[in-house]
């Protein structure tokens, strides 16, 4: 990212990483190396969670937060049958904000999280 003069770096771990200690250690190492290459980086560490996982995502988030020190979350698949009620418990339990939500598969379907609009959509959902 630095050599290509990029402002944003996304690292996809392909999920279920928290169940494998070796992979979690490797992810910690990646974070340390990024900090050495670019002092002060990473500037934010966000965990992307699938809203359809429900309350199971809280235990997953806790493990990632312990390992990496998260700054917040991105909740995906909020366009399906899942209403994303886990958002409230997740944010309360870890005291971290939801930054973005995914409501589809296209880049424009990734939206900045607006708590008021989210609650309104939950309450007035048909």
Predicted features and spans:
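P-loop/Walker A NTP-binding module and the surrounding RecA-like catalytic core of P-loop NTPases
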Residues: 1-126
